[in-house]
Structures are given as C-alpha cells and as structure tokens.
Amino acid sequence: MIRTQDISVCTEGGSIQQKKVSDLKNRVQMVERTPNALLLSIHQNYFPEAKYHGAQVFYAKTPGSEALAALLQQTLRTCVDPENHRREKPAEAVYLMEKVSCTAVLVECGFLSNEQEAEKLTQAQYQKQLTGAVCSALCSYLETEGESQ
C-alpha cells in the first residue's frame, strides 16, 4: 500500500477509538496478505520539547528488520545529516511493528516540533534528499537480501 493521501483503512462505524483500532488491524491484515512483504512506514516525529531533531529508524523484532534499520540510519546520516548521531532502535509498543511477521521498519524523518527541522521538512530539496537516502538504503538492502537467499 502506498499512501498519497491521508486516508484511513478503518472499518466503518464505531467510535473514533474503534476506528483507529480497526485501521491498524486492517493494515496488519493487508501486510500479512502480501507475499514477500516488507513494511516501510514513514513518519514525522513530534515531541513537546523543541530541542530534539534528526531522523531515526525503529525496527520490528522480525528477521531482517534490524539490519534494514541500521542501513537506513547510516544512509540518512551519510546523505542527509552527518551531525545526526541517533541510532536505530527497537520499536517498542508500536502496534504494526509488533503484529507483522515480515521485515518492518518505521522511519521518523525529523521533528515537526523543532522549528528549524520543520522548515526543512517542508522544502522540496530536503524531501528529495530524504527520499533518495531511503530509496538507496532500501535498494542496497534488497540487493544484499536477494544474494543471501
């Protein structure tokens, strides 16, 4: 599934909370029905304090996830922000990451709560840098993964 709009895949009816839960469950089902799936979830981060910045990658406990996350984190550092010293981390309490059986990562591209980073995240050139880094890392991972199978 590639989203180009902010849409929900929830089951109709119910409260807002029930819709959020059904949306997540339906996403898991979509991933699980897809042969040879790989989940790449891309987000923008937010934290109440504006001092935090930098892209960070989180990974599921499934095979290949940590390796992909490490490659993504390193590529984002190299291609986008050499001063970013964040490290990839396990995704704790993230429903999708806990429920899927495929390789799965969540990329937080930056902090909307940091004024300077929020500004960069709206710029087309910076967005191209981010997507280029993510695509490069993903292609490298898939090439390496293909060789190991």
Give, region by region, the residue ranges found by the protein language model.
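Active-site-adjacent mobile loop/cap segments within catalytic or ligand-binding domains
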Residues: 34, 41, 48, 85-149
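Active-site/binding-pocket entry motifs
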Residues: 7-8, 78, 112-113
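Peptidoglycan cell-wall recognition and remodeling modules
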Residues: 10-12, 18-19, 83-87, 108-109
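Active-site-adjacent substrate-binding region
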Residues: 64-90
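Stable alpha-helical elements in mature extracytoplasmic
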Residues: 20-27, 65-68, 72, 117, ...
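Catalytic-core regions of hydrolytic enzymes
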Residues: 1-67
